[in-house]
Amino acid sequence: MEQEQDTPWTQSTEHINIQKKGSGQQTQRLGRPNSTQLMDHYLRIMSQADMHKQTVSWKQWLSLKNPTQGFLKTRALKRWKSFNKQGWTN
């Protein structure tokens, strides 16, 4: 089998997997992660991103459920200005 040349991508995807056996002294170096490892990593990252999105939307929802006075004032002014721009044509 022909060996691939190292490119910046393959160099960056190389990793070291340390497995402790018996005396805990053996280390095994793996070349590139296999597709299962890449998929696990991808799913882990995406679930972290999803958790962040949920947290942000939850905070926004909470601010709507229990808004501060400043937030209400700003929101009311924005609505009033947009209403005045439309005029009484509606």
Swiss-Prot record:
It is found in: Host mitochondrion inner membrane; Host nucleus; Host cytoplasm, Host cytosol. The keyword Protease does not apply. The keyword Membrane applies. InterPro entries: Flu_proapoptotic_PB1-F2 (IPR021045). The record marks N66 as: Low pathogenicity. Residues 1-34 are annotated as: Disordered. GO terms for cellular component: host cell cytosol; host cell mitochondrial inner membrane; host cell nucleus; membrane. Is not encoded in all strains, and seems to be dispensable for replication. Plays an important role in promoting lung pathology in both primary viral infection and secondary bacterial infection. Promotes alteration of mitochondrial morphology, dissipation of mitochondrial membrane potential, and cell death. Alternatively, inhibits the production of interferon in the infected cell at the level of host mitochondrial antiviral signaling MAVS. Its level of expression differs greatly depending on which cell type is infected, in a manner that is independent of the levels of expression of other viral proteins. Monocytic cells are more affected than epithelial cells. Belongs to the influenza viruses PB1-F2 family. This is Protein PB1-F2. It comes from Influenza A virus (strain A/Swine/Colorado/1/1977 H3N2). The gene is PB1.
